[in-house]
């Protein structure tokens, strides 16, 4: 009986949400989140870019992801040389190569887009998820930590996150990253890195930078 009551309650809540979607918002919450984040980042002088969903194996190798890398088994391959992107970073590196030659520094860009991984770490992971990646490149090295914290605060505030933590964590791609965690349940909301970084060499990039990737569904 208790289960039936709970089920009835949850069904009622979901129907109310659907009715609210139709009568009030008329846009999915994730879409509204994207708009809020896009608007605030543009206001803060970041430029939105859009890159392809299909990624070449060559670009993955530039991220040190080869056939022996742990992430390889999580990739959705379309053929032997192309896959659905597991991350936004490779194409953003490619875009930054050109922008650094054309624009005055610092160069500030961001992208919001779908990424795909065969995740195997429980119910909190999905094969398709929406990432926000923002990068500021060409700033002074001594300002990196401060700027990273400013960007983390900007995004979390826009997303309505009232309590979060920043801590160091190991990464299969970057070696070590700085994670942004929900202050209540320690769920990872985003992951940040700073350069110069060893991965920069493959893209002929030498500038100091900060970058953060957020999972929008988690925000």
Task: List each language-model region with its residue ranges.
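TRNA-recognition modules of translation machinery and tRNA-sensing kinases, especially anticodon-binding
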Residues: 1-219
């Amino acid at each position: 009986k208790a289960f039936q009551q709970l089920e009835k309650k949850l069904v009622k809540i979901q129907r109310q949400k659907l009715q609210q979607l139709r009568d009030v918002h008329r846009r999915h919450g994730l879409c509204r989140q994207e708009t809020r984040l896009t608007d605030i980042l543009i206001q803060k002088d970041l430029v939105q870019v859009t890159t392809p969903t299909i990624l070449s194996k060559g670009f993955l190798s530039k991220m040190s992801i080869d056939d022996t890398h742990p992430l390889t088994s999580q990739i959705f391959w379309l053929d032997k040389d192309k896959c659905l992107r597991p991350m936004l970073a490779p194409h953003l590196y490619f875009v930054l190569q050109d922008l650094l030659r054309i624009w005055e520094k610092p160069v500030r860009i961001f992208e919001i887009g779908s990424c795909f991984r065969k995740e195997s770490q429980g119910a909190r992971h999905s094969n398709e998820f929406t990432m926000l990646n923002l990068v500021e490149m060409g700033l002074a090295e001594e300002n990196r930590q401060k700027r990273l914290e400013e960007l983390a605060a900007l995004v979390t505030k826009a997303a309505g996150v009232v309590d979060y933590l920043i801590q160091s964590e190991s990464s299969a791609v970057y070696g070590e990253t700085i994670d942004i965690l929900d202050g209540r349940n320690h769920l990872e909301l985003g992951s940040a890195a700073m350069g110069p970084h060893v991965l920069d060499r493959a893209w002929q990039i030498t500038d100091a930078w900060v970058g953060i990737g957020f999972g929008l569904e988690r925000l």
